[in-house]
Amino acid sequence: MKLFRSNVGPFDLEVAITGVKMGDQLLQLGCGNGKLFAVLASKVGLTGHALGIDDKLAACERTKAAAEKAGVFAEVGHGNYAALNSNDSLFDLTVIHHIIGNMKPEQRVACLQETYRVLKPGGRCLIIEPALRSGLGALFRPSAIDPTYLTSGAEQGLKAEGFRAVRRLAEQDGAAFIEGVRPPD
C-alpha cells in the first residue's frame, strides 16, 4: 500500500492554487524561464487563451521555447507591466510571478492598476513571490525585495488598488501565494 504520491510534478502546487481550468483567459506577468507558464497554459486548452508578458526579451524567448516544447498554444509578448496592451475586463486569472517585490513603488502601483483593469469582474489576481526568510536564513541570504514593499506587502497593495477578498493562500517551498478578486460590477 502506497501512502504518498510519488508522481508529483514540479508545478502541481502552483497549478492547484491558481485553480486554472479549461476555457480560462489567463495572463501571466513575469515569465522567467517559462516553465510555469507552459504548465498553466496547457490547462486552459484550446477553448481558453494564455498570454505571458515579460519585460526581458531573453525571458520571452525562454518562455516561447518552453511553451513550444510543452506543445501548448500560447501567446508570449515583451512589454511593460504598467502599460498592458490588452482590452479591459478580458482575463479570468492573472498570475504575477516573482516580479512585484522587485519593482519601484510607482511601478508596482501601476502594475496592480493595470492588472485590475484587464481582469473581468470576479476575476482573480494571484501573486506568487518569494516567502520572507527569518532566522539564520535571513542573515545568510538577505532579500533583494524592495524594503518599502516589505513593510506593506502584496496584501496591502492589492487592497489599495480595489481588490477584495484579499488573502494569503499559502506559504510553501519558499514561495508565498496571495490572492485578490476584482469585485463584480
Report residues per predicted region.
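C-terminal alpha-helical "lid/dimerization" subdomain adjacent to the S-adenosyl-L-methionine
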Residues: 4, 123-179
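Conserved alpha-helix/loop element of class I SAM-dependent methyltransferases that forms part
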Residues: 5-24, 39
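Class I SAM-dependent methyltransferase SAM/SAH-binding core
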Residues: 25-27, 32-83
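A short glycine-rich, Lys/Arg-flanked "PGG" loop and its adjoining helix->strand segment in the class I
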Residues: 109-121
